[in-house]
Every structure is written in structure tokens, then in C-alpha cells.
């Protein structure tokens, strides 16, 4: 199987890189605005240029293409490294609005940059029977009332609407349902939570939050019919961001090893350093292959739950090894905040727990293996 990038994907990568370079989002300078936790000008340019809307139908405001194209964008943003609402706002929310009935209007607004969204309380719903309902929706006079809480919602205090997965308990209507809750809703409270990646995350509480029927996305109680595939896509794109960050750290460490002189020779001439760099290179390449393999499976319309879990679990471990090796090569210089190495390290660390820990992802793979062996 040929996993090398296509000409279109190379053009997408070059396009994203050009926008990042124009805004100073490079290895030596990564601007981050404290409000809303990313550079709004850069994000606006990425949206208006259409690079972050690849993989979505042109009829709905996207740029067309496949999931593999979104993976290229994620990899380029991770390589920046750039904090943005890409995987949460565009990928996860966009794919949910695309998959759920009646999400077209909101999807158009998202892809046009007219409205911002984030996901809330989604984790675990792709594993039926394993999730306790943190947010519950019950019928009310105006439509629906939401109560409960969710942790670590990315940009939860800054978006126009939160796409909240809630468990409906209303007569015959039961089960997970997606609600688009305005960020300004009465009874919705946010509490900022600092993260290692610097993303603006918040714990969100819902206390008698009222929304009408127009804020139900898709069919009531039927979210699990389409959510697993959306989670698969999210895991693959997040893994791609980790690969990009690891590749950035490796490139920086390689340059350092070739220019840092000790005892009248570049430290890259030492075999121990060469071995570290070689191992890190293998980790980056194999992680990248796992991502593109999983993306290809999704693009072909095949069942991708195991492949997506494998890709994210492997990338979580491999990319952390790469950033750790880069720090060892840089030595004490690598811990200074005026050096960019810690940014790639933080980016990987922040992405690892999203949409399932390594342990949980491996349990998905293990269950599949045991099921297959039992069937034989």
C-alpha cells in the first residue's frame, strides 16, 4: 500500500505552511493570544483560505476532498506548533454536524467562520454501556432542560455554541442526543482550567439550561448511530497533530546536533546521539504511516474503530518518545521557554488524553483481537 502523500496533499501542506509562516507561526516564534487562547488573525486566515475546511463537501462550504486531506492539515498545524480550534471545532464538530440530520446550516456557518463551536461531554459515548450520563436532558415547556457537568471543554468559555452530548430521559425517547447549546445560555457556567498545552479549556456546568427543539442536532436518542465514526475521525486527526509536533521536535533536535559543538566536534558526530536521532526518525515515520493507514480505511468507508484506536495509541507513545529524545539531545538548553522545543513537547502531552487514554484505546484493540480469535 502506497501511503506517500498525493500531489493534492502536498499542495495542502504547502498552503497551510505558507499561511503559518506569514503570521510568524514558525519554530522560532509562535504567537498565542490569551483571549481566546489562539491567534484569531491566523485562525481567520486559515478558515478564509479554505485549508482547514478540506474534507468537507463543497456544497456545504467545504473545499472537498477526503479525510486524508484533513490529516495533512492536522500534521502541518502540529508541526507549527499552533494552538487552534482545529481538531475540536472544525474536525469533531464539523463531522458531527455533517453526520447528524439537520446540521447543515450550522456546518455552513462553521466552515465560513461565522460561528464557532466546540464539543462537550462526548468521550465514552462510542462505547455503549460504558458511560455514565454526566449531562442529562429532560423535557420542559420550552423544549429541553439540561443539567450536569463536563470537564476540560476546549474553548468552552469562548465559543458561540457548545455541541453537548446529553442522555435524554423523556418517556419513550431515551439515549444519547446532541444539543447545540448557546454559550450565553442562562444557567451555563464555565470555570477555566490550565492545561500543559496552553489551550483554554474549561469545566462546564449546566444548571436548568433551557433550549428549544431547534437546538437538537439529529434525532433524539440516536447519536450513537453516527458518533463512533466521528470519534474515529477525531482520533486520527489528533494523532496526525501529534506526528506533526514530533516531526518538528525531531527537525529541531537534528539541527541542534549538527550545529552544537563540544570538544571541537558537532555533538551529532557522536554515535549515541546518532542512535537517538535514528530511533526518533523511525518513531515519526511509523507513527505517520499508522495515521495515513487509518485515514485510508475511513476514506474507503470501512470499519475503522480498531485502526483509529491503534493509530492514536501508537502515536501517543511514539511521539512522546520523540520529544523526550529531542530534549535529551538539546540538554539544558531545551528547557528554556525562549527556545521552542517545549512547545512541541507540550503539544503532544496535551493531545495524548483526548478521546481516550492509551490504556482505553489498547483495550479496544485487545477486545477486537480476542473477539477475532474466539470466532476462529
Where do the language-model regions lie?
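A structural signal for short hydrophobic beta-strand segments in well-ordered beta-sheet cores
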Residues: 135-138
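Internal helix-loop-helix
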Residues: 48-108, 155-158
